[in-house]
Amino acid sequence: MNAFTQIDELVMPLPLEPQGYTIAPSKQSPRLLELTFARETVEAFVQAVAQWPVQALEYKSFLRFRIGEILDELCQGTLRPVLLNTILDRATGGMLITPIGLDDVSQAEDMVKFTTACAHLIGRSNYDAMSGQFYARFVVVNSDNSDSYLRQPHRVMELHNDGTFVNQITDYVLMLKIDEKNMEGGNSLLLHLDDWEQCEAFFRHPMARREMRWTAPPSKKVAEDVFHSVFDTDTEGRPTMRYIDQFVQPENYEEGIWLNALSESLEGSSKKVSVPVGVGSFLLINNLFWLHGRDRFTPHEGLRRELMRQRGYVAFPKPLYQRGQ
């Protein structure tokens, strides 16, 4: 099967064949494509960008685009069109990316560089207030006393969109697994809006476009509340979402009851997909029509998982493309 055949509206011409990596539909969903980079491609990239530590990417933001260019050149110019077309394609919009040979925590800096290169072939990653950088690294362990579900291992992190409590355009989310030990469970959970059984009913409800207040706990280091609706549309009138159950603050009974019903519908959807992500692999999804979450872990005293996220905007003038925000 040619994974390209699902993309209806191209924003750039697609290559006849990928070079330096392969593409295939994932086992979990035909909407989620798997990109696997050959070891030779990965090794060549690591060597080519060795002169720049991650700190250089933090200080000089243009270098993030330069290392993206290097990765695309190693793939003979075939990578950027695939990433852009996929992230903007409503029928897909999601990728599980695996760079062969980057699979140990000792290679964490190279993992950050590789993910940064991919992200900056489609756009730019936003400032993350939690870390003070364009990315955030954090650890999940067996016990947790933080102020959100992000690091709590023994419960499901419900489906949500990122960027709900900041005034930043958040078109994409990238989630990398850097390390894990003594892990059982904890798969990524994904739901595409067009697969959600009750999407139309909630999208048509009067509450869908009501402006609501969104706040963040202290750990997010965001002081100001933001106001926006749960639903919006793209230019073709299709639903997009900006939603997270933890940070929305209903003003009254009616809003609270509707939000609770929305949450129960999302969590009860039979169309959720559970995706295992290996160390060094990462998900790159369109944040406006994919929701993501995390399944619970099996308790273990030595449990440890280190993750990195980037989230940002797509920087490409696709005709009729609207961010829905």
From Swiss-Prot:
Cofactor note: Binds 1 Fe(2+) ion per subunit.
Record carries keyword Iron: yes
Pathway: Amino-acid degradation
EC number: 1.14.11.64
Cofactor(s) for this UniProt protein: Fe(2+)
GO molecular function ontology, one term from the record: glutarate dioxygenase activity
Binding residues annotated for Fe cation, in chain numbering: 160, 162, 292
Entries under InterPro entries matching the protein: GlaH, TauD-like_sf
Name recorded for this polypeptide: Glutarate 2-hydroxylase
Gene that this sequence comes from: glaH
